């Protein structure tokens, strides 16, 4: 059944230079002809060739309400694989909404969230991993995160997985022939070759899985708790990383009583910073609640920046904080290095991945912290142009495929017979097909595209 022609605003809402309304479907040119009048009367919208543009006015009935440009794309050479017309009007909600309403009145249907990319997937213009990369690219905040998404959109992951599928398919074909046609005298698989192929597939999947956490941080950022006792310099650190005075800084201990939030871009990593209340014993009920929230943020954070006052000896609260950071992705910052140091970092070093002397009032410390964060989170080692996994769906499929490949290796090494190896190889192939979307159910497709906004 032919899909309805759909319309939606494809650009972000709000004031801007232009807004784009996208039409896709078999009736796109006819709908466009009812709302767009070319300035050159000799030109006909329905006859426009692909990859061409026209200037004219947008109309609703007999009334012209704006002027702009129409871009034309003929199927299958378009984003969705269908006839597509993109109408560029002046930016602003009122004009763009009116243009959409005119398109709907002319016969189009409202687009659902992600429907354009969904159609691109269903029409074979994008694989499922590439469709997911579209959303990652839209959401990317940092350069490396955008590069990872762009690599996936270009097919880096799909190509890597297809290569592993080809290796396993060749093995499976040989196994099937050997098991099913014994009368044909099919030679048994060479053990060394079997081990080499299965090990190679497992190692490729292991590499993708190992890098998943760092790749995800580059794409999505990480929650970062700034913790320490009062007046250690937590709010000063927040302001340094934010690049402006986000938090109030005073000499009075306990100034910060609630969690102060601020998203910052530190190098290629987006940090969702949480400046917490100073950790100390208190009789003040309000401050005590702030301290409880501080400990909670520490437990939940994907990164901890623990700030210590380097101008004073370590206190009981400092040592308690250090112990709570043990085994977590935590960096100790010995603040106030511009003053005489009385803090012995060796007392807390066993509990942290790194201990850094800093001055939270100096820009140089921001660069030091940025480099340390990238090292700790593993983002500095990531090749942003290589294949990478994105999201729990892809990770789960990769884990299943890796475990099945490992099972095939164990079956071969344990002498369980080629039938057992064949079952494991089948499982690995099925998981890889799930990853690339070849076996994707309607429920999986719905889950992928519900993350998209209307217009994409």
Segment roles from a protein language model:
Residues 55-65, 70-74, 254-282, 300:
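Switch I (G2) and immediately adjacent beta-strands of P-loop GTPase domains
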Residues 1-147, 151, 155, 331:
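A glycine-rich (often HGG/GG-containing) alpha/beta subdomain
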Residues 271, 303, 331:
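Short, Asp-centered acidic motifs that coordinate Mg2+ and/or phosphate
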Residues 242, 277-278, 302, 309, ...:
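Short glycine-/small-residue-rich Rossmann-like dinucleotide-binding loops
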Residues 273, 307, 333:
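Generic enzyme active-site microenvironment
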Residues 2-9, 13, 143-265, 282-284, ...:
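C-terminal-of-GTPase-core extension/linker across diverse P-loop GTPases
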Residues 287-311:
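Inter-motif core of Ras-like GTPase G domains
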